[in-house]
Regions:
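C-terminal and inter-domain tail/linker signature
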Residues: 1-138
Length: 138
């Protein structure tokens, strides 16, 4: 399957997927999400957060990856964070050059949003990325 092709076949839940866009970020890419306060800017910061998030996810299984519209790409997956169930939808907007320009990551349910924000806040405590996550009490 090519990176941009879609897959929603329920018998093909993928655990070996690597996001093509992670190695194709625009220099000025932005990232947002329900667990993120504000907007993360720049390829280095966005890549770091995505790679670290992938380490936090347990049992990540992709239900769908594929294009939407002319410049969009979607991912839908389930995972666990510290044993808690989590569903995630990622939208990627490509720029004219085909690079990932803007990401939006939405976790659900709300308890998972807050848990993810706290876990990432603990990870980034004392770093410039801490301001995007919950660090109170860390």
């Amino acid at each position: 399957m090519k990176p941009q092709e879609g897959s929603s076949n329920p018998t093909r839940k993928r655990t070996d997927y690597y996001p093509w866009w992670l190695d194709n970020l625009a220099d000025d890419v932005t990232g947002e999400g329900a667990a993120i306060q504000g907007t993360i800017q720049g390829a280095e910061a966005v890549r770091r957060v995505v790679l670290d998030a992938r380490k936090v996810y347990e049992n990540q299984q992709f239900q769908f990856t594929g294009n939407y519209g002319d410049n969009g790409f979607l991912e839908e997956y389930t995972c666990q964070i510290q044993g808690q169930p989590n569903r995630v939808v990622v939208t990627v907007h490509r720029n004219a050059a085909g690079k990932a320009q803007h990401l939006v990551v939405n976790h659900r349910p709300r308890s998972s949003v807050l848990l993810f924000a706290r876990v990432m806040g603990e990870k980034y405590a004392g770093t410039p990325l801490a301001k995007y996550f919950i660090t109170t009490g860390c």
